[in-house]
A protein has these predicted regions:
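Short, ordered coil/turn segments that flank beta-strands lining enzyme active or ligand-binding pockets
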Residues: 1, 19, 37-38, 239, ...
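Sec-dependent N-terminal signal peptides of Gram-positive bacterial secreted proteins and lipoproteins
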Residues: 1-20
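Generic detector of short alpha-helix boundary/capping microenvironments
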Residues: 6-9, 27-28, 50-51, 83, ...
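Active-site-adjacent loops and short helices of periplasmic peptidoglycan-processing enzymes
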Residues: 16-181, 198
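Domain-terminus/edge residues, biased toward the C-terminal soluble/receptor-binding domains
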Residues: 161-402
């Protein structure tokens, strides 16, 4: 039966000033999340996992998919469906053609609904086809309760349910999107002008993300509003090397347009005053594992228990080590002063030979507040052969006939 050993590694964390925690009552949003943008850990959540309509914050997914699945110089043909989308819209006409890159600025700066549909139909063949790609990507990113029906965030419903996401999932999507430099460049642009491919129609769009100029370190952001969703907002901010993602759903209705800025500032302040990055602690010292029915190696490297019979014992001790995957090396986490990461090693009491070098022996789990952050393999340092009848025959022949 596996023996579970808990080893707590003390972490030295920079001093930070204690502040009052972000209380649900202090936020206007129905759902809110403050996330560690480097690893997706939720630092604060208010109904973080409750599904809600998310309006034009949907366009974060539309944009990142377009950047990954198409080229900026693609010709996008406008359909009647795209041209008939409600406000806010660019005002494109059926049959017009645009470069995809220009429509991405229209999509993310001014949040044009017709541009979203034109992009979706170009890439997915239809709105429905593009929605399938959106939902596939959401699952790939680890979203737990997200279902996309429309590329612009307008209310929609299909056999999979209504168009919705959660504050946690929305933050996760933004954390992924900002890894794309072109996405960041587009969403940081204040003003952009372009024409259709014919060059006859000129357009100018201004970024509606006013938060770009309210705080230092804003990397990206997207606003949204429908009568059903209320005001929504998601942004990424890096301050003092700390990467925060804020996601807000249902943050007020007309007359309270600035609630989203207030909530975002509160959450960022809470993050700055309570969290500092720390690296993973050192691995704990791992025990040696008893290996039964083992034959010694050529140099007999293992400590053995002699039975004075002239033959080797059948038990040796195996040294083991933990290995972090390449993707987990250098990971760090935003922690409060009172938080520590613990290592939990899951290892067998003993194993039978043979054992191969670098064979998996167990697992080492990094946990915080009882939740797993990551896991890594524990492997064998050396090879151990199994002692067999042939080994005994060879031993006798060597000892008595040579």
């Amino acid at each position: 039966m596996a023996a579970v050993v808990l080893v707590t590694a003390a972490l030295i964390i920079c001093q930070i000033f204690p502040v009052k925690a972000a209380d649900d009552e202090n936020l206007y949003a129905l759902s809110a999340v403050l996330m560690d943008g480097e690893n997706g850990r939720v630092l604060y959540g208010k109904e973080a996992y409750k599904g809600r309509p998310n309006a034009s914050t949907t366009k974060v997914m539309t944009c990142i998919l377009a950047l990954e699945l198409a080229k900026g110089d693609d010709y996008v043909q406008v359909s009647g469906n795209a041209a008939s989308q409600p406000q806010t819209r660019l005002g494109m006409r059926e049959g017009q053609q645009f470069y995809l890159e220009d429509l991405l600025y229209s999509l993310m700066l001014k949040s044009h609904n017709d541009s979203a549909v034109a992009i979706a139909e170009h890439i997915g063949g239809s709105v429905e086809g593009f929605a399938e790609k959106m939902n596939e990507k959401a699952k790939e990113l680890g979203c737990k309760d997200t279902h996309f029906v429309t590329p612009n965030g307008l209310d929609g419903e299909d056999e999979g349910g209504i168009h919705h996401t959660t504050a946690r999932d929305l933050a996760l999507i933004m954390a992924y999107a900002i890894k794309n430099a072109t996405f960041v460049h587009i969403t940081q642009t204040r003003d952009y002008t372009f024409t259709d491919i014919s060059g006859k129609k000129h357009y100018s769009v201004h970024n509606t993300n006013a938060f770009l100029d309210m705080e230092t370190g804003v990397i990206s952001g997207k606003t949204g509003f429908t009568g059903n969703a209320g005001y929504c907002y998601v942004c990424a901010v890096r301050q003092d090397e700390r990467l925060f993602i804020v996601a807000l759903l249902g943050c007020g209705w007309p007359g309270n347009k600035n609630y989203k800025w207030s909530d975002t500032k509160k959450l960022l302040s809470y993050g700055r005053e309570n969290y500092q990055y720390v690296m993973l602690p050192e691995f704990p010292q791992l025990p040696e594992i008893l290996v039964t029915e083992a034959a010694p190696g050529k140099e007999d490297p293992y400590p053995q228990k002699s039975d004075h019979s002239g033959y080797p014992p059948k038990q040796v001790m195996l040294k083991i080590h933990a290995v972090l995957s390449e993707k987990d090396r250098g990971k760090r986490y935003l922690l409060k002063k009172t938080e520590t990461i613990t290592w939990e090693t899951e290892l067998p009491d003993k194993l039978p030979a043979p054992i191969q070098k670098n064979q998996k022996i167990g697992t080492l789990h990094a946990k915080l507040n009882g939740k797993e952050l990551l896991s890594c393999l524990v492997t064998a340092d050396d090879k151990i052969d199994r002692i067999t009848y042939k080994w005994y025959v060879d031993k006798v022949f060597k000892d008595y006939f040579h």
